[in-house]
């Protein structure tokens, strides 16, 4: 299935040119950018997304405080074989700030609204960290639409260990500058290898992130933390029959391999795979082996 997306007059066309209605608007980015920014109305919010590549569609969901640019180092290879739909979650990136508290289920509703608007009925889902938790909710809400799940560096139930870390970040967001918060979180995301020999492309990505702005706002970040604190799907995912790859860095200290094993064990069609010599942000620290594993898995589970 190949899908072409356009952002013109609120119309989405498939490869045959069939006209499809979409709840779609086009805004603009920063003043120095002339590129159209497609946004989808999801309830009271507008949610930003980007598209890239050709092939079977894949929905990409990023983690806590992150936006679609966090996929930049794996995006080119993924886009060679798949049509990517990269979403900025509510309270992050170019999407709107939420008016109040919400759950990861609400964020899954946002993601499904994007796929509705671009006219894609069935797709793969790739989620990292909080995005992996949202991906679980997407599959639970729309099991017949999700062809496969790739869950990176994620978890199925927030335990006391992870809750303590998240609560500390919630407090730090109030007390520190966004840049200081990012520096404090970096050792949780990368291994010692990164600090010994930081890859130039990751440093460039970090510099670009600092220029764009690390956080949407402190309240926005805290609302996402609160949604993560309430996450618990381990008793729900056994209902899924979706082929699922739970991918984790072998040295991930934030969502360690024990989380991946527990989640994969709860998924009837789940398998766990470790990426060697990398940590939580495996898609940044070791993008090539991460991408290779994702693409091999997706190739085994086509939409048909």
Locate the predicted segments by residue.
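Conserved HGGG/HGGXW glycine-rich cap/lid loop of the alpha/beta-hydrolase fold
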Residues: 43-97
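Active-site loop/oxyanion-hole signature of alpha/beta-hydrolase fold enzymes
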Residues: 86, 90-126
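Gly/Ala-rich beta-loop-alpha elbow adjacent to hydrolase catalytic centers
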Residues: 127, 131, 135
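Flexible "cap/lid" loop of the alpha/beta hydrolase fold
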Residues: 136, 140, 147-176
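Conserved alpha/beta-hydrolase catalytic His-Asp/Glu region
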Residues: 160-162, 180-236
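Short beta-strand/loop motif that positions the catalytic acidic residue
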Residues: 240, 246-248
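Acidic catalytic loop of the alpha/beta-hydrolase fold
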Residues: 251-255
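Catalytic active-site module of serine/aspartate enzymes centered on a nucleophile-bearing elbow/loop
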Residues: 270-304
């Amino acid at each position: 299935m190949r899908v072409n997306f356009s952002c013109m007059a609120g119309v989405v066309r498939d490869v045959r040119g069939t006209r499809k209605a979409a709840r779609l608007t086009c805004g603009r980015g920063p003043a120095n950018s002339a590129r159209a920014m497609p946004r989808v109305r999801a309830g009271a919010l507008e949610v930003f997304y980007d598209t890239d590549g050709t092939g079977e569609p894949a929905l990409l969901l990023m983690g806590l405080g992150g936006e679609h640019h966090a996929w930049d180092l794996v995006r080119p290879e993924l886009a060679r074989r798949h049509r990517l739909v990269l979403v900025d979650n509510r309270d992050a990136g170019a999407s709107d700030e939420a008016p109040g508290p919400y759950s990861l289920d609400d964020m899954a509703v946002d993601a499904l609204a994007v796929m509705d608007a671009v006219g894609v009925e069935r797709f793969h889902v790739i989620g990292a960290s909080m995005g992996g938790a949202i991906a679980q909710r997407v599959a639970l809400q729309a099991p017949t639409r999700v062809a496969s799940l790739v869950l990176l560096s994620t978890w199925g139930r927030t335990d006391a260990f992870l809750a303590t870390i998240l609560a500390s970040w919630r407090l730090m967001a109030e007390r520190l500058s966004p840049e200081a918060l990012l520096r404090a979180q970096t050792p949780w995301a990368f291994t010692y290898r990164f600090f010994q020999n930081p890859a130039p492309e990751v440093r460039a990505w970090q510099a670009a992130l600092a220029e764009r702005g690390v956080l949407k706002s402190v309240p926005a970040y805290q609302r996402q933390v609160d949604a993560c604190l309430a996450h618990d799907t381990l008793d729900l995912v056994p209902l899924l029959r979706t082929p699922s790859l739970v991918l984790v860095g072998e040295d991930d200290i934030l969502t360690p391999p024990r989380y991946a094993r527990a989640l994969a064990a709860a998924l009837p069609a789940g398998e766990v795979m470790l990426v060697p010599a990398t940590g939580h942000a495996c898609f940044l620290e070791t993008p090539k082996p991460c991408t290779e594993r994702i693409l091999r898995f997706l190739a085994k589970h086509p939409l048909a």
